[in-house]
Amino acid sequence: MDIKRTVLWVIFFMSAVMLYDNWQRDHGRPSMFFPSATQTAPAAASGASGTGATTTAGEAPAAAAAGAAPATTAPAAQAQLVKFSTDVYDGEIDTRGGTLAKLTLKKQGDGKQPDLYITLFDHTAGHTYLARTGLLGGDFPNHNDVYTQLNPGATSLTGDQNTLKLSFESPVKGGVKVVKTYTFTRGSYVIGVDTKIDNVGTAPVTPTVYMELVRDNTAVETPMFSHTFLGPAVYTDAKHFQKINFSDLDKNKADYVNSADNGWVAMVQHYFASAWIPQQGVKRDIYAEKIDPSLYRVGVKQPVAAIAPGQSADVQARLFAGPEEERMLEGIAPGLELVKDYGWVTIIAKPLFWLLEKIHGVVGNWGWAIVLLTILIKAVFFPLSAASYKSMARMKEITPRMQALRERFKSDPQKMNAALMELYKTEKVNPFGGCLPVVIQIPVFISLYWVLLASVEMRGAPWILWIHDLSQRDPFFILPVLMAVSMYVQTSLNPTPPDPVQAKMMKFMPIAFSVMFFFFPAGLVLYYVVNNVLSIAQQYYITRKLGGVKKKPA
């Protein structure tokens, strides 16, 4: 009857294990519990990131042929990479298809570490991630055709410019010529993409514009236990945010809205995302599919009204490629902030992040914001914690009497249980009275876990002294050691289980958890350390001042 703390530790441990196993399966890695098909190793792309590189996507499967964006064919003409630079991007546009083939996000470090650049789009021998467009509905220009840069000149955003425009013209195919224009704006992670379709033939044409993101299933390199969802996502007013697992695309079992006149499609990874955002109110079809052993795409197909000879049509869209900063995403498109995925705890996690952000706005340091948020949460839950610790204090007081009863009736379990129940009744103690207050707090605990895990704001954010990046593990393992010590102290304050096996398990738990926490992001471990220290202080105070009672003889 005295195993409630053991039960809670087991629940906590199993929750952590299941979270990790869920991450394993989300990223195409073998589950620890459920068998899965072996993932195919990423196929090497044939392009390189130098001049003349092309966007090779492999042959599309037969199922994707009808009405789908074309697969990449063998190059018929030499393509080039046009480099560009803005205050937030360094990138390359491949003239084959006018494809956005490389995009590096620039973020300045704090001077104590390298600048926090990350390459989002890329096309190398080991990794493919592209944003491309083209036309369907006839032998029209698509991403396999070599475009020509119009008005070659400055490709960098200078100090007195707010926008940078780069235009590319396709060859004439099927009586159609396409001019694709990228517009980069200072300080913005939203790229304007304008597709101008000129009918230079002698008959009307009715093309369809496709806009897609192509990516392999290679996991992003981040610290252990720091991964979230990786894969395509679709947002519509009808179904809101729908994640699509690569494994579902492998089996052709993906479930998502395939037609809408609103929303967006995206590729999501830890901390960063890209999304095609067509104009609202314009009908489009949505598709997501596997096009190579390790290559996938998600996109939209938007029909264009008939274009008479000598006339033209414009299709405008926006391409987001940047960090998953919640407030910024909310201002770009409805629902785009959902790419920062908190899973089933979103309803609790979003208010927690809002509060964390407000505290950061005051103190200006994410580490101290975590500390203050933890203190605030502990204050809110103090009545529940007090009830739990009072119950544990009472149990600790009567533990000697319980042990005496167990020893006296060890040969008669029924009499022993009856005597224990009578003792609980006499002393007005509920052996599980400390469990419910703790269980109620578990959703908040898990929600804050995901807040700290999913927030790109932690990336490169320093705290004090040796902690220069709250999204990375503690380089000297000081916080995990403090975590282990605090867990040991907290365990020692609890009633000692009468069962020797349970007692050993309680002593082993801090060691087991500390090993796991050695690989957690420093911001997450900081929360646990502060939470444990506050819990120890609360428990000590309540045990000594509020929950203390005089021992009675057995």
Swiss-Prot record:
Any matching Pfam family: YidC_periplas
GO cellular component terms given for this protein: plasma membrane
Cellular localisation: Cell inner membrane
Keywords per UniProt: Cell inner membrane, Cell membrane, Chaperone, Membrane, Protein transport, Transmembrane, Transmembrane helix, Transport
Superkingdom, taxonomy of origin: Bacteria
Membrane topology: Multi-pass membrane protein
Segments traversing the membrane: 7-24, 362-382, 436-456, 475-495, 510-530
Quaternary data: Interacts with the Sec translocase complex via SecD. Specifically interacts with transmembrane segments of nascent integral membrane proteins during membrane integration.
Protein task: Required for the insertion and/or proper folding and/or complex formation of integral membrane proteins into the membrane. Involved in integration of membrane proteins that insert both dependently and independently of the Sec translocase complex, as well as at least some lipoproteins. Aids folding of multispanning membrane proteins.
Family under the similarity heading: Belongs to the OXA1/ALB3/YidC family. Type 1 subfamily.
Name by which UniProt lists this protein: Membrane protein insertase YidC
Species assigned in the record: Burkholderia vietnamiensis (strain G4 / LMG 22486) (Burkholderia cepacia (strain R1808))
Gene designation: yidC
